[in-house]
Amino acid sequence: MKLNISELKCQQHDKLVTIYCCACDAYFCKKCDKEKHSQDDNQEDSLHIRGLVNKDVIIGRDEEDDDDEDDEYDNKIQDILKKSNNLKKSNSIGGNIVENIELKSPMKTDSPYFIRDKNSIQSDIDSKITEKIDLDNLIHEEDDPFTIGINSNNSNSNNLIDVNDLHTPSTPSPLPSPSLSRSSSTNIKPQQQTSPSPSRSSESNSTTNNNNNKNEKKKLKNSSNSELNRKKIYKKEKIIGDSDEEEHILNNGNKNKNNKSKSVYDYDDDDDNDDDNNNNNNNNNNNNNNNNNENDDNSNSKSEGGVFYSSSSETEKEIENVENKIDNKPKPPNKSLPKTPQSNKKKKPENSIMVKNLDSGLVEQIFEEEEEEEEDEDEVGSESGGGGTIFKNPYSNRKNKSGKYKSNSCALEEGEEDDSSIQSQFDGEEKEAVHIVQGIVEGAILFGTNIATGLSGIVAEPIINIVDNQDNKVKGFFKGVGKGLLGAVTSPVKGGSGFLIKTAEGLRNTPATVFHGDHEDLMGFSDADQVKEREASHIFEGIAQGTISLSKNLYLGVTGIVTEPIKGLREDENNKAKGFFKGVGKGLMGAIVKPASGIIEMAGKTAEGIANTPHTIINAIEMKIDEKSNNNNNNNNLDSDSEGETYVNPNEN
């Protein structure tokens, strides 16, 4: 038997219907579903529960299957179509199936997938349920509870035709529907079930089961004063659908649920006895407690297949149960604080009692404020010469060679270095000029800067000293005037010395730049990486530094004639001749340039010492005055303390 695919096409768009809506009781193609259930157009229709049509039922089996399997499959489809007709013709259900049907997911009742369709709930409490439904947790493809069959007699009004058993303790025991009789044309055995369900059996049992169903219906009508609310309970069936259609319907679903289910049409040969026993138990009208126990067993079993109708006493009680289960949904745990990589900042306490009682956002804010304060403290200012340079505190990165943090203890750990060696690298930030042009340019800039500093000090120094000496502003003013005039005289001298020193540096490093570019001298240090020597504080220190520089440059200039060619041979092993001639050129050029550089640097260092001598003398005098004043204050404090005390002779007693 083959179904006519043309009967399954949408008349409006001429496309295959792939979606079924329980609330609308209709089939839709992808475009129709977008128009009907768009969240922007109609908020209520967007809450309708919809499922993908079972493509295995629509398309049919492959032609390569055996004849026995084809016959079995044809019988299944015929049985499906009969059930569809019975559902449609049943007067107890009505034209719209969903109005009297409660839809449930195969998940547990406390699962976020436990959801009701909006049209199946009373209008006065509709909003309470829909507000608590998490729209981000829609039913996923694997959790889709719908199985759709096709009515070949009427292609325009297809109905939901097959469901599975799932009963919760909150619902009474399910009873077989009078509209769903056993099919007389099928020999398919149903899968084993622990609760009463309509099954496919042989022709000899079909008539007795129909009579039992009719008797059961009469008993239910006589026992209830109000009309029974018939509900259809669905359980999951694996749905086969296109990926784009799944995205359209289930775009907000959780796609990582690994729940597997067997097909509705997986039957075992040994299930006849169990199914007959279950039907007999149902026909004998067991008490409600036994029925509830059977419902519990059904909810945990994996048996699938069959259609059930359950009668409920009051709809409001079940709605309250749904609300409670939605409210009791477990909340996800709070996110822990993110781990921060190792840095020079304080580590966050992991097991602190104080942190446990604080909110995670507040804790993160506290740590961020502490880190910002530490970053501000790491920025340190140091004055060198006339201007000041800002550089990163070398002690902020207290790491040893292995990458670990250094401790604050006095003893040096393994792999650590003395802090004095680190600090010495930052006493001066200026690097030597690598050639003569750079030396002249930097020297000219330094000369102009010192002149500007000296002239501005005439005005700035009196103001600064008045602010610093609030107790005696007159004294501070004249002190500032003296410093300003002294700076105006010494700053140009200091600028001239800086120009000479920079020029000497560039001249000394020119040969290395021209021939090699690596700026390495005999000691193995890079001239460009050498830190500038500290300034001479007085004239004698300037003369001493200048003499040392002159002697060093004379020595390097003379010995370089021999040592530079040897170095060229060692460095350039691939082309020793090239290295040799480079060394010869570097040595000859250094023999002329380096002594000249030493003479210029000696003059510059001497001028630097002369310029700094007045400041050194003034600072020494101020320090002596401060020391005397501090000593006098200490003596006065001791005298005042001694006057308040009385001497007691211990021998007087």
From Swiss-Prot:
Q: Which regions are flagged for Acidic residues bias?
A: 266-277, 366-381
- What is the membrane topology listed in the Swiss-Prot or TrEMBL record? Peripheral membrane protein
The entry's Zn(2+)-binding residues are C10, H13, C32, H37
**CDD domains to which the protein is assigned, alphabetical:** Bbox2_MYCBP2
Quote one Gene Ontology molecular function term: zinc ion binding
Task: List cellular component terms (GO).
Answer: membrane
Q: Which domain of life is it from?
A: Eukaryota
* Keyword Cytoplasm included in the entry's annotation: no
Bias type Basic and acidic residues, positions: 314-330
UniProt similarity note: Belongs to the VPS13 family.
Give the protein name, as stated in the record: Intermembrane lipid transfer protein vps13l
Q: Which organism is it from?
A: Dictyostelium discoideum (Social amoeba)
